């Protein structure tokens, strides 16, 4: 989703605010 940058540790497509 649209939001602040976060660290994502996944190969799936993640947006800025998608915490995985």
Swiss-Prot record:
Record keywords, A-Z: Antimicrobial, Fungicide
Biological process annotations from GO: defense response to fungus; killing of cells of another organism
Taxonomic superkingdom: Eukaryota
Role: Has antifungal activity against B.cinerea, F.oxysporum and M.arachidicola. Inhibits cell-free translation in rabbit reticulocyte lysate system. Does not have mitogenic and anti-HIV-1 reverse transcriptase activities.
Name of the featured protein: Arietin
């Amino acid at each position: 989703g649209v939001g602040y940058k976060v660290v994502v540790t996944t190969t799936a497509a993640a947006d800025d605010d998608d915490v995985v």
